[in-house]
Each structure stands twice: as C-alpha cells, then as structure tokens.
Amino acid sequence: MTRKYLLVAALCIAAPCAAQRGVTGVRDAESLRAAARQFRTSHEPKILREFADLLAIPNVAADRANIRRNADLLITMMRSRGVDARLLELGDAPPAVYGDIIVPGATRTVILYAHYDGQPVTASQWVTAPWSPTLRSKSLEAGGTAIQFPTNTADRVSGEARLYARSAGDDKASIMAMLLALDALHASGRTPSINIKFLFDGEEEAGSPHLLQILERYKSLFSADVLLLCDGPEHQSGQQQLLFGVRGVTGLELTVFGATSALHSGHYGNWAPNSGVMLTNLIASMRDDDGHIKIAGFYDDVAPISSAERAAIRAVPPVDSALRHSLGLKRTEANNAPLAERLMAPALNLRGLSFGGVGDHAANVIATEAHASFDFRLVPNETPEHIRDLVDEHIRRQGYFVTSDSVTTDMRLAHARVARVEWASGGYPANRTSMASPVARAVISVVRDSAGNPPIVLPTMGGSAPSYMFTQVLHVPVIILPIANYDDNQHAANENLRLQNLWNGIETYTQLIGRLGSVDWR
C-alpha cells in the first residue's frame, strides 16, 4: 500500500535549541540506529531476496532490454515505498530513474544519486555466474562456501557473509540501503526530516554520456540543497568515509602499425619494424615506473595540495603497509607515498596490451599491429579535451603520424610510424566540494552520530563520477557517501558485498533521512 508522508508534529523537522542540540542529537541518533537495526533483524530474509531479485537482472548499459527491466523493477520498488517515481527518458538511451518524497514542512531537500548499471563481465572469470546472486559464508579469498539464502528470521546470517553478483557493491547496494531506510523509518512510525529526490543513473559505467542532457531537460525536478553521491567503497581501514570530490576521467584506445601482413621472425626479424616493440617504447615515453607522467604540459594546470587537504590526509588511519602485505606488493609507486596523497594527483593507467600471442598461442611472427588501452584520471583544472590534445601532440613528437581514421596502406607507405588514436566519447573533469561548508558540516555531524565516531573525511576519491554535471547544471554541492566493502572486487570478476556493509548502510541512510533536516546547517 502506498504510504503518504504527512507530518503530524514539528519534532521531525525542527532543530533543537543550541543548549540541547548535542544531547538531543545523540539521543535521536541512538533511537534511529536502534530502529533501523530492529527493522533489519526482523526482515533479513525479505531484504536479501529483494536484493537478489534486483541483482539477477543483467545490467550492462549497452543491453537496452535488460537495462529497461532494471529500471522498471526500480520503479516498482520505489512506488511500493510511497515514492512518486517515474522514468526520465532521452531517445533510446538507458532511462534515468527519478522519484521524490516531498514532506510538508521540511526545509531541506537532498538528492540521493546512485547508478543501477554495472561493468561488462567475462563470465568465464567468475566462480559463479555474475547475474546468479550467490550467498557465501565469507569471502572467496578466505575460503567462503556457498550457503542458502535465509527463509525465516530465525535463520541468522553472519555479517561477514558475502553476496556475490555484478553490482552487488557497485552500486545496487546503495540503492537498496536508501530504500530500506525508508522502510525502517516507516516501521518505527517516523517521518523523513528532509525532502528526498532519488536519481538512479542507467549508464554511469559507460561514462554517463546522456546524463548532462537529462539533467538539462528535467532541471525543474532537481532543486535541492545538496546531492549525496552514493557510490564507492568504504575506507581500506574499514571505517566509514565521506569524500568531497572525484577525479575526472578520459579513455584512449591506441594502435600502432607495422607491415601489412604478419612476417616470419627469422626471415624478417631485425629488419621489419616490430609493432609490439614500437608500442611499448611509446608507452615508456609517456609514463615512468613510478607513475610520473612524462607528457609535456600534463602537470601545468595541477594545483598544489592545500594545507587543509594535507591535514585531512594526515588524519587518515595508516593502511598502506597492510595493503601492500595483503596485495603481495613489496613496493608501491612514488617511493611508497601514502595512497590518499597519490589519489590527489593525475594518473595514466595502462588497462590492457595486445599483440601477437603468448604461451600455446605464441608464433614466430612479427605482429602487424599492437594495441593498448588507457584511462587517464584527472584532477581539478584539467579537462578531458586538453589532456587529449597533449597526448596526441606527445605521440606526434615521438615521430608518429596520428589519425583517428582507418589506417590504409598508403598511410603506411607515406609515414615511418603510424598511430591510430580513438578517444572515448564519454569522460568528464574532476570536481570538488569544500570540506568546511555548512552543508559539509551538517552531513559529517549526522554520519558521525550514526557511526558513533567521526568518519574519515577526504578531499577526493580516486575513482571518477559525473559529479561536475550536478555542480554545472543544478548548482548543488556534491558529497560522496560510500557504503560497500573496500575489497568488493569492484569492476572485476567475483564482485561482492559484505552483508555487514549493507546493514551499516541501512543505518547510515536512516540517520541521514531521519535527522539531516533537524541538524544545524549554519
């Protein structure tokens, strides 16, 4: 039955007086935490079944039919909770899912953003099928075995259990947590303290190529005080974190060419140019072994880390040594510089390399072409367009004729070195929100009370998200609230969610929806 959110008392939205605010805030937080926990423990089988049903639908953005099935199911899930939900459509692009709860008397409005699409999969790399949700007693790396989904509340499942499926952590967990927070509030007889606007993106993993147009077309729906970008993992220490920025991103597919046909390496080696060697030398000219980018002008627009940002980084619990140990790394780049500091810098990542064959597929030939795939992570003041120009010019300076077209024999005959560059159509710049703004302090306060201790606060996450669009079009600050476990195999095979992270996420969103409108935003 659809629920109507009508305020019957001002207590849900009125801020307590200054003398009582601290005590009242703690009591409210404890009460909401208990309510969320009570709801969850009484409904675990139903929660996990609903989550599994959502995870069972393939969700690669290019699979339009299944993306639509995801969107339709989300509409059903939202409407069942009293959310006024609809699809925001733009041609044949994956629809964005929108919904809102407008609370009479609420003075603050929050957009909750997440994405319902996931990364493409190579099914053969998964222990169990990526869209056949599987519950395990613990992580695969720790020897976890498959267990049955609970069928009644007496069947207790450990918080260390893992749910394996594509998008279990990235990013359907956040969608589930925020919708279940509505259930927890309703079950406890409470009302949201804020107006809520949900926005679920259907092609974030494809670079959100249509999101800007959707925001512009439906801009009137999105008046708000802040947008919480609900994506990403917890800190590697296992603590809750809040992040106030993202790095930008752009992608490149690069191909260099040798002879028009594969040549016998004995008859033509040391004479015919080897495309694999050409490509690896070109890559070495772009980046050194410590991650420093050698492309001229790449760092010209990069601002130094501010004193406030350095202070935030210094306050982060040290995790680098433990991470190196768990990942089997004797050293990390930049003379073992802290991870949080390295995420403040731009990066060039080699995603893949392909030419010839290895092992049983090796042949004594000189490959006709060699291919590499890159992503570039950008920081504020850098734009994808400028980075593309710098990279193209760098390749030319290495003696290459650069084209984005198909390479012909005439091109090979006319130029000693030929490179085809194919830049991804998506991509976006970095974005940051002040960590000291009133809205930042309000969100930090509520999350602190929810967790019982201060969250880790960082200027940026290492990954990328289209948050600049929200700042550019909607003129709202963006704060990132991740809930997934840091070892969730995000974007990789055997993606998973630790159940305790979902349980904690429900409590966090219950606090935010239930209390954010009643704390001091000054």
Question: Model regions: which residues?
Answer:
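Metal-dependent amide/peptide-bond hydrolase catalytic core
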Residues: 20-26, 31, 235, 251-496, ...
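Hydrophobic h-region of N-terminal signal peptides that target proteins for export
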Residues: 10-18
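Extended, hydrophobic alpha-helical segments in both membrane/secreted and soluble proteins
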Residues: 196, 214, 228, 443, ...
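Bacterial N-terminal signal peptides that target proteins for export
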Residues: 1-6
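Short glycine/serine- and small hydrophobic-enriched flexible loop segments
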Residues: 180-187, 281-285, 376, 511-514
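Acidic/His- and Gly-rich active-site-bordering loop/insert found
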Residues: 21-168, 187-194, 374
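Acidic/histidine-rich catalytic neighborhood of metal-dependent amide-processing enzymes
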Residues: 155-245, 520-522
